[in-house]
């Protein structure tokens, strides 16, 4: 454990320390979402509900089709003459996942969480089994053209065995928290922040799968890093939670000289955002409610995901922040989107998450089609630097293949906004 640097730089007159209310060192944006009329709120709710219904319908249809294909492949290659039990169990687990997800929005119990975990694991195995089925059919067809005989059953067993092994690896890999070290040059970085470190953690998804025990692990690792500030860029929760205070209780143990800052992600929108925010605030974390705070010359800006996702609201909020373009600014925004606006408004560094890096193969490829090079890691958009974390937790399938669960320790240095070191 490294020795902490002297903290004389933090000894400032009363009023300079960031607070949740407007005052010295803090500028609260004129909350655009608070001015929304009741009609617009109802309209937004209806749009969200329609999107959820459409997503669930398409999602369930695709999963049931994948189940049918996997079961049909097993039956063919294993030469089953009677209906095997997996033709009931596998689709049942798929339906159980959707049911547990929807019921979890209203109820919280150990049994429901257990059902969610078991069915979520099956979805991961189903993902790899689907591609194993495709491979089995292709290899079997190719083998038929060769002079050497290959037993189709052995081919299928080999691929399905590989699918199960990959699922086990993905489950173990998802539970290994790695520390990623990044050193970033930021133009006009205040002297007080040069050489200081900040920890970035996103996408814990505390809820059905990951509970307070996981939060304790994350907090312990961050505490060992001794960062000068901690940034939580959304999806701290997985959705609605009956007792959010239990999940955020471990954060009371964490301290950082310059503060711990948080903005919401899209999953907080699935629950009562105000209730979740209140729980986070009670834990001692500074919730950036669409506001800018000045911490020893560094402008720290936070925009919640709902507002950051709307280009007009996002632009309006950043304009209201009245950023000083001659000074360094860090933006917490859950998704690496609307980057042209952030760059135009003079943001120096944006810290995001959301993508999970794609989480499991082959969706790692799909994620890059959506977010491009901003799917993961440190990248540049004009004068804006963007770090997108793959997150500490998982959503849905509790597995990671081709990605890692991470906490990012960023060392700040004064310079031209270029990447120095990344490992």
What is the predicted role of each segment?
Residues 6:
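Catalytic cores of secreted/periplasmic lytic hydrolases that degrade extracellular macromolecules
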Residues 42, 166, 182, 298, ...:
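A broad, low-specificity signal marking well-ordered, structured residues that form hydrophobic/aromatic
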Residues 185-423:
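Soluble catalytic domains of enzymes that build or remodel membrane lipids, polysaccharides, and related
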Residues 120-133, 177, 215, 303, ...:
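Long, contiguous hydrophobic alpha-helical segments, chiefly transmembrane helices and signal peptides
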Residues 1, 15-18, 23-175, 417-421:
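Non-catalytic terminal accessory segments
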Residues 112-116, 145-162, 170-200, 207-224:
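N-terminal signal-anchor transmembrane helix
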């Amino acid at each position: 454990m490294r020795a902490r640097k002297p903290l004389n730089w933090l000894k400032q007159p009363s009023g300079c320390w960031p607070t949740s209310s407007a005052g010295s060192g803090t500028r609260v944006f004129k909350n655009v979402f608070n001015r929304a009329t009741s009609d617009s709120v109802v309209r937004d709710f209806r749009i969200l509900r329609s999107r959820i219904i459409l997503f669930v319908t398409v999602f369930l249809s695709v999963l049931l089709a994948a189940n049918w294909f996997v079961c049909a492949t097993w039956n063919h290659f294993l030469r089953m003459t009677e209906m095997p039990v997996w033709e009931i169990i596998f689709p049942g687990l798929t339906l159980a996942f959707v049911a547990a997800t929807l019921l979890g929005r209203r109820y919280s119990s150990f049994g429901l969480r257990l059902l969610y975990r078991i069915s979520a694991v099956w979805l991961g195995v189903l993902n790899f089994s689907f591609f194993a089925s495709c491979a089995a059919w292709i290899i079997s067809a190719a083998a038929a053209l060769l002079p050497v005989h290959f037993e189709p059953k052995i081919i299928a067993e080999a691929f399905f065995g590989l699918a199960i092994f990959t699922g086990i690896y993905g489950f173990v890999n998802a539970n290994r928290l790695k520390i990623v070290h990044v050193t970033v040059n930021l133009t006009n970085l205040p002297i007080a922040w040069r050489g200081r470190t900040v920890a970035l953690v996103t996408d814990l998804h505390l809820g059905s799968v990951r509970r307070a025990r996981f939060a304790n692990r994350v907090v312990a690792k961050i505490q060992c890093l001794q960062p000068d500030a901690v940034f939580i860029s959304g999806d701290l929760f997985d959705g609605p939670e009956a007792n959010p205070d239990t999940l955020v209780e471990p954060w009371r143990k964490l301290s950082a000289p310059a503060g711990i800052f948080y903005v919401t992600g899209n999953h907080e929108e699935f629950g009562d955002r105000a209730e979740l925010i209140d729980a986070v605030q009670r834990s001692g974390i500074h919730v950036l409610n669409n506001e800018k705070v000045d911490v020893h010359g560094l402008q720290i800006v936070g925009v919640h995901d709902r507002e950051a996702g709307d280009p007009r609201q996002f632009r309006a909020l950043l304009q209201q922040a009245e950023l000083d373009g001659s000074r360094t600014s860090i933006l917490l925004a859950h998704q690496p989107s609307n980057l042209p606006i952030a760059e135009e408004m003079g943001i120096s560094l944006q810290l995001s998450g959301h993508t999970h890096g794609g989480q499991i193969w082959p969706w790692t490829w799909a994620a890059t089609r959506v977010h491009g090079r901003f799917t993961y890691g440190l990248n540049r958009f004009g004068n804006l630097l963007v770090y997108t974390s793959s997150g500490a937790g998982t959503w849905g399938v509790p597995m990671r293949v081709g990605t890692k669960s991470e906490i990012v320790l960023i060392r700040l240095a004064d310079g031209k906004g270029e990447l120095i070191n990344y490992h």
